[in-house]
């Protein structure tokens, strides 16, 4: 337990927020470069901040810290992204503001295989074939993020 009213707690909170701002700035830079390469402009920017903590108020007015590990904010009307995998689509969603989920939604399809097991069992040629069959060119990522380690996003979203 880390008390955010202590010096250490305040330092942690500031550091975590700086890391979040850094990640967001990097995503904006990636999006800007993609838009430039495609000679277009984004119609909207949707953040998918996850594995992060926020100060929020519950329905009863209690202020709490919500840490969303594997989840993303989904307050009423808030736009979000639920990614699939390297070979499946992602979904742009609008939050329902469901209090029983603390205004949160899944950050993705969910794993069916751990990172360590994926690194031990999936080969690079196997990954390349799966992606080639889907017409996907890999420019980043590793075996622990291979499409076969995730649930089918279409089933998850239905």
What residue ranges belong to the model's regions?
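Domain-length cofactor-binding catalytic modules of enzymes
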Residues: 1-158
């Amino acid at each position: 337990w880390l008390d955010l009213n202590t010096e250490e707690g305040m330092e942690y909170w500031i550091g975590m927020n700086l890391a979040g701002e850094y990640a967001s700035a990097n995503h904006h830079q990636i999006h800007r470069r993609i838009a430039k390469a495609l000679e277009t402009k984004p119609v909207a920017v949707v953040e998918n901040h996850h594995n992060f903590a926020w100060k929020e108020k519950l329905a009863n007015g209690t202020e709490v810290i919500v840490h969303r590990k594997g989840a993303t904010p989904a307050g009423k009307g808030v736009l979000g992204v639920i990614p699939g995998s390297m070979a499946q689509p992602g979904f742009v969603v609008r939050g329902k503001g469901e209090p029983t989920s603390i205004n949160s939604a899944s950050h993705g399809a969910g794993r069916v295989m751990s990172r360590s097991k994926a690194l031990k069992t999936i080969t690079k040629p196997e990954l390349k074939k799966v992606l080639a069959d889907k017409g996907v060119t890999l420019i980043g990522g590793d075996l622990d993020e291979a499409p076969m380690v995730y649930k089918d996003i279409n089933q998850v979203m239905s």
